[in-house]
């Protein structure tokens, strides 16, 4: 099977993506826009129940300073999951359908910065697997 995904590195009307039945993965900038995605909890609930996957773009790219920490980014994901759970989404379903990625593309970044971003992303992924 080939999954179909969409990425939006800004804010949008997320119902556009959640209501398209052929979209399997929604990749969003969780670092910059998680608070706005939470506003679409009902749409996300339906999306996840039909097997949709949320890809949390948690490691910043253009705004990457090098001061970001694994603990801080994992806390942001935990806080996001808690916010969505309070809005009625099933925590287990969120965790079963969770991917992580950089917040946006790395095409304009140098190799050194890109490598640091992917190292941090790996650390976030490993921490989530252990703690959530």
What residue spans do the PLM features occupy?
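Distinct, well-ordered alpha-helical segments
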Residues: 10-21, 44
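Residues that line or immediately flank small-molecule/substrate-binding pockets and catalytic motifs
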Residues: 8-11, 30
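Catalytic-face loop-and-helix region of soluble metabolic enzyme cores
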Residues: 21-131
